Amino acid sequence: MAKGQSLQDPFLNALRRERVPVSIYLVNGIKLQGQVESFDQFVILLKNTVSQMVYKHAISTVVPSRPFNVSNHQATNAQAGYNAQHDDGDEK
């Protein structure tokens, strides 16, 4: 698994499993809404009245419409590792 996938896979999988409605904002400003039906390394399949294949490189932000659990030990460890690498010691 690539380092960049260690947070997004558990996040997207939890959205898919719990059928959480999401808003996906593209880099060009377009807002798409639906539920994550499936995903892979390059695309997210978003289902609303129709299914849309959205390329990840075109996505700016994924916003869940409600709280959900990302209960994945790997995601927690990845975030802790990221925080440790980016902690410069300056507390504000």
Swiss-Prot record:
Family matches, as CDD domains: Hfq (cd01716)
Region Disordered, residue ranges: 73-92
Record carries keyword S-adenosyl-L-methionine: no
A molecular function (GO) term: RNA binding
Polar residues biased stretches: 73-82
Organism superkingdom: Bacteria
Key words, A-Z: RNA-binding, Stress response
GO CC field: cytosol
Record PROSITE patterns: SM
All copies of domain Sm, residue ranges: 9-68
Any Gene Ontology biological process: regulation of RNA stability
Subunit structure: Homohexamer.
Family: Belongs to the Hfq family.
Function of the protein: RNA chaperone that binds small regulatory RNA (sRNAs) and mRNAs to facilitate mRNA translational regulation in response to envelope stress, environmental stress and changes in metabolite concentrations. Also binds with high specificity to tRNAs.
Protein name: RNA-binding protein Hfq
